[in-house]
């Protein structure tokens, strides 16, 4: 289409277009993602020609508490307010989110039933859900032709009642919780989730949540990670594991590497009080050792034991307080403990050797006495026969 240049006078005047403007509902997802500047338009008033208000709007503004009609857009001049009103509006604007109703002064007065409208405003939640859809911003009605207040109130009331009926027909389970952005109920997304994974129980420390777009995911609070699939749904068993379905014991998992079995999935986090005993106990097979195991030599056999430690090992217990053990280093104490064990083993070895020598002496004496008795018996027999 061919466009013609506009003069400065035409540009400065707001365009008055015949017809009725219909507000397009914004998606809740886009409303949460867009900043308040894009949603509600600029808040700085522009210097334009002042439109003469009609008599009905003037009468309505005079009867109210200083609230301006909503069909005046941001193209008007700044409204004169008291300093107290300006401070109150600024505090509300800074403390509340941009999509919530600031105060009772910001609620449009053109609605036919103000009490029912305020009741619906209370449904506005943290994420800007169904309650905020009944609030009309001022900049939407820019350039709209002025009509008597009675006609606008009737049309707005019909529009509000229509949306109110739609909101009542919506299932309550489709709304989001007030505690989070992406937390929704499980009943509203039953057709989007996998019924096979819902039957499986979640391991301890796991929970289910949904994204803003309604996709289900799982949260592992033990490792602070998220996963798209159920932790027990995927059969990605570690190497050496096998899943066994038994009619007697049920379903359990066998670890062929460590020769053990358990009911808990190997990928699930281990909680001692929830772990059940394994149904099968492995009998380890005795394997023949072809090669002898090399044991390292004890370093204390060749170490030189200090004289004071030998004296301490033979001294009575009542003299233990003489040594100041707190002055020794931890590594030195470990070394001296090993040396004391070596002295103890040597003492035991000496005692065993002494007892063994005494036993050998007893056995030798018994053998000698037996031989003597036999010799005396033989000599006595020879004497008696002769």
UniProtKB/Swiss-Prot annotation:
Regulator of STK3/MST2 and STK4/MST1 in the Hippo signaling pathway which plays a pivotal role in organ size control and tumor suppression by restricting proliferation and promoting apoptosis. The core of this pathway is composed of a kinase cascade wherein STK3/MST2 and STK4/MST1, in complex with its regulatory protein SAV1, phosphorylates and activates LATS1/2 in complex with its regulatory protein MOB1, which in turn phosphorylates and inactivates YAP1 oncoprotein and WWTR1/TAZ. Phosphorylated by STK3/MST2 and STK4/MST1. Phosphorylation is not required for SAV1 stability and may increase the number of protein binding sites on the scaffold molecule. GO terms for cellular component: cytoplasm; cytosol; nucleus. It holds the Pfam family WW. The modification Phosphothreonine is found at residue 211. Homodimer. Stabilized through interaction with STK3/MST2 or STK4/MST1. Interacts (via SARAH domain) with isoform 1 of NEK2. Interacts with ESR1 only in the presence of STK3/MST2. Interacts with WTIP and AJUBA. This is Protein salvador homolog 1. It comes from Mus musculus. Disruption phenotype: Mice show progressive hepatomegaly with a 2-fold increase in liver mass relative to total body mass at 1 month of age and a 3-fold increase by 3 months of age. Embryos display unchecked proliferation and defects in terminal differentiation of epithelial cells. SUPFAM superfamilies: WW domain (SSF51045). PANTHER family: PROTEIN SALVADOR HOMOLOG 1, SALVADOR FAMILY WW DOMAIN-CONTAINING PROTEIN 1. Residues 345-374 form a coiled coil. CDD domains: SARAH_Sav, WW. The lineage of its organism: Eukaryota, Metazoa, Chordata, Craniata, Vertebrata.
């Amino acid at each position: 289409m061919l466009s013609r240049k506009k003069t400065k006078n035409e540009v400065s005047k707001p365009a008055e277009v015949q017809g009725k403007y219909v507000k397009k509902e914004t998606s809740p997802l886009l409303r949460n993602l867009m900043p308040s500047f894009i949603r509600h338009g600029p808040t700085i008033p522009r210097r334009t020609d002042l439109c003469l208000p009609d008599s009905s709007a003037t009468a309505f503004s005079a009867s109210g508490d200083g609230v301006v009609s909503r069909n005046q857009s941001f193209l008007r001049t700044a409204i004169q307010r008291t300093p107290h009103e300006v401070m109150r509006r600024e505090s509300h604007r800074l403390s509340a989110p941009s999509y919530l109703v600031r105060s009772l002064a910001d609620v449009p007065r053109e609605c036919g039933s103000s009490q029912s409208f305020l009741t619906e405003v209370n449904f506005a939640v943290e994420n800007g859900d169904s309650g905020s859809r009944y609030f009309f911003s001022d900049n939407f009605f820019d350039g709209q032709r002025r009509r008597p207040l009675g006609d606008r109130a009737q049309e707005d009331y019909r529009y509000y009642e229509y949306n109110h009926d739609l909101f009542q027909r919506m299932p309550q389970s489709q709304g989001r919780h007030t505690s989070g952005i992406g937390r929704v109920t499980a009943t509203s997304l039953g057709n989007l989730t996998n019924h096979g994974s819902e039957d499986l129980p979640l391991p301890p420390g796991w929970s289910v949540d949904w994204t803003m777009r309604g996709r289900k995911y799982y949260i592992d609070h033990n490792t602070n990670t998220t996963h798209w699939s159920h932790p027990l749904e995927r059969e990605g068993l570690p190497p050496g594991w096998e899943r066994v379905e038994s009619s007697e014991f049920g379903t359990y998992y066998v670890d062929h590497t460590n020769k053990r079995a358990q009911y808990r999935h190997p990928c699930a986090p281990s909680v001692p009080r929830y772990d059940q005993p394994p149904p099968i106990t492995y009998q380890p097979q005795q394997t023949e050792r072809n090669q002898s195991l090399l044991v390292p030599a004890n370093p204390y056999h060749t170490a030189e034991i200090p004289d004071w430690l030998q004296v301490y090992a033979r001294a009575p217990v009542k003299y233990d307080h003489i040594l100041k053990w707190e002055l020794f280093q931890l590594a030195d104490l470990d070394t001296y403990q090993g040396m004391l064990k070596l002295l103890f083993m040597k003492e035991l070895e000496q005692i065993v050797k002494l007892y063994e020598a005494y036993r050998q002496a007893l056995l030798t004496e018994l053998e000698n006495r037996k031989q003597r008795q036999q010799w005396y018996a033989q000599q006595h027999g020879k004497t008696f026969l002769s």
